[in-house]
Amino acid sequence: DVNRSGGVLLLAQMSSRGNLLHPGYTKEVVDNGVAHDGVFGFIGNGSRPAELAALRATVGEGKMIWTPGVNLAVGDGEMGQRYGDPTAAVLSGSDCIIVGSGIHKADDPRAAAAAYAEASWKGLLQRNG
């Protein structure tokens, strides 16, 4: 106990092409992270629902999963990013989607933010049935 508030999100997966994670990386990170109370969650791959679902199955419900790599325009980005559907990410186990360019590069960022909120809420309602 170090008498502090807060916690850590560990990077378990990446959505960008050509990332430097080796094949056993996710398992190592999750094994270490679930054992420590200071770790409240993991960063997962929002562009690959199957990978994200596998992460959720391994992590269980006791830790959060936050996911970048989501965009309403599913596909590849300008710098090697891969984007998946935000609703699919939540259905696959994400607790929180992380959105950057999908909002700040939109013609109407406010409307885009509302669309992402709606998409993630839809996924959460479907997931929790």
Protein language model features and the residues they cover:
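Conserved anion-binding
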Residues: 1-64, 71-75
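Generic secondary-structure signature for well-ordered alpha-helical cores
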Residues: 3, 35-38, 95, 118-126
